[in-house]
């Protein structure tokens, strides 16, 4: 659209009509998901993972790329590199780090995630949200808990009981 010409490409996807329902669920989720109890990267990842999991439940016919406002190619990149991204978070000891720069690198809207590696420009922004979503999905698949229990559980409980193990 001509009004969006000055916006960066990574933001333009949010202006698509297909994003209307996911945006409504995002707004709703802020009212039902308690904010993280700490400022660690893992807590923020899980918080947004819960939001995206709500989209799984409330918008089951939408594809993952629409739910997270990625392109199909970005979803494929996430799937293909999930193990690599996870190893990076673990090896760099970022999960329990509360450095205020981490959300800007891995959670906040951006053209790409900032690992400080050659893959940066290939990676989608907000990769931490996507990984958090996979952790929440694993938790729900491997535990008999209600949605209410999920929403009230803290990040450590979810992570510790998720049995999350990405493919290498």
What spans do the regions from the language model cover?
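A cross-kingdom marker for long, charged
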Residues: 52-168
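Acidic/His-rich structured neighborhood in mature extracellular/periplasmic domains
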Residues: 1-75, 155
